[in-house]
Design a protein with these regions (language model features):
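Generic short amphipathic/hydrophobic targeting helices enriched at N-termini
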Residues: 4-7, 42, 106
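Basic/aromatic-rich interaction segments and small domains that mediate binding to polyanionic partners
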Residues: 26-74
Length: 117
């Protein structure tokens, strides 16, 4: 994935370790403890592009048993290493609601089947 692929509704897979090392200290713990990870990979969706501030707002899926917050939203700098992010195949864009309805097993299947570019 590159910056040009970051459209609202794009669902992607990214290495959790890369994101964790790029986060500020207090965000690191929240991310490690609350975002659903499988095989060191996380699944997210592009929610908003803030050109003025230079950030892309993304929501990451949390474990299915968390009924309070189905996702955690964080800002990712435009200068991030976008080639670490892989678009989920099919090119279909999701609404935020559709993304938050994904189950852990759906994400595991995407990762196991390498259903991303």
């Amino acid at each position: 994935m590159n910056y040009e692929d970051t459209n609202i509704g794009t669902v992607f897979i990214a290495p959790a370790s890369y994101l964790i090392e790029e986060l500020e200290e207090k965000e690191k713990e929240i991310f490690k403890n609350r975002v659903f990870q499988y095989d060191n990979l996380v699944c997210g969706i592009v929610d908003k592009i803030d050109s003025k501030r230079g950030y892309v707002w993304v929501t990451f899926k949390v474990p299915d048993n968390n009924y309070v917050d189905p996702g955690i939203t964080l800002a990712i700098d435009f200068k991030a290493n976008w080639c670490m992010f892989c678009v989920v195949k099919g090119g279909k864009r999701f609404s935020s609601y559709q993304f938050l309805c994904l189950k852990e097993q759906d994400i595991i299947e995407i990762i196991k089947n390498k259903d991303y570019d």
